Amino acid sequence: MSQTNLSRLYTIALIAVFIYGATPVFTKMATATADGITVGALRAIVAAPLALFIILVGRYRVPLRRDAIILVVISGMGGLVLFPVFFSWGVQHTTAGHAAAGTAFGAVMAGVLSALIDRRMPGWPWWIGIATGTLGALLLIWEAVGIEVEGVTWQGDALVFLGMFMGVVGYIAGARLTKQIGSTTVTMWSVLVAAATLLPLIIFYSGAETLTAIDRDGWGAILALGWGSTILAYLLWNRALADGGVGKIGALQLLQPVVGIALALMLLGERITLPLLIATLVILVGV
């Protein structure tokens, strides 16, 4: 691969990592004018028109088989209904920095859940990594419970972790179907499943009063979540993986919590504590 192509590859990957890393900050900005449940629901709904456009242009179809349809539904419900709703709800009650650190624990959850589903017993280095990552997550909860940090609650952190777990369930279901029909097809159809599921929530739970109370910055943050985190970052990241391979590109994901914590400091003025930094480092070491 030429130096020019390599630079282009890393640029695409880093843009995706930046958008993913900024997701907790976008979410925190959105929850300033709407509750977390509404923000999580709107994230999929505003992404739906773009997802539908991509499906129509690319002619992405899901096979009308029972197993394929079930996996798409699980992918959509886990990754694009339950994950954003619980995650956004959690961010409403904690800091973006804590949420950013919590996203790193998703890789640990994915490893454990995959091992359980596949009924395999990994070696001791894997268990050491899992234990280390779990220790980092417990450090985050410990800070929320035991140290007075403005904006941090253990309930918010717990909701973030619950959202990450639901997202991992959706990710694993989608990954199994990806081998058959491709990742873009799975993701775009999952967005439509999620939007159809969440639309009644917006109508009957949020209502017109909540939607009209969202200001311009709030809608900008929600659009960034829907179009950026859900669609654009996904397409860029998978393009980088396809061209460069997991071995060369995958490690860049470790920058996501770093980006999130840095943006929380710069854009939101959040206090970055020593326990938060230590917990993030410990989780990354475990990953």
Predicted regions and their residues:
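Membrane-interface helix-cap regions at the ends of transmembrane helices
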Residues: 18, 22-29, 33, 47-65, ...
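Transmembrane alpha-helical segments that form core, pore/gating elements
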Residues: 51, 110-112, 116, 130, ...
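Specific transmembrane alpha-helical segments of multi-pass solute transporters/efflux pumps
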Residues: 19-24, 52-103, 139, 226-244
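Structural signature of hydrophobic alpha-helical transmembrane segments
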Residues: 32-49, 88-107, 153-165, 215-230
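Cytoplasmic-side transmembrane-helix entry/capping segments in multi-pass membrane proteins
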Residues: 13-14, 66-76, 122-134, 157, ...
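Helix-helix packing/entry segments at the starts of transmembrane helices
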Residues: 40-42, 80, 84, 98-105, ...
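Glycine-/small-residue-enriched transmembrane alpha-helix faces in small-molecule transporters
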Residues: 1-41, 85, 149-176, 196-198
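Hydrophobic transmembrane alpha-helices of multi-pass small-molecule transport proteins
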Residues: 51, 73, 105, 122-144, ...
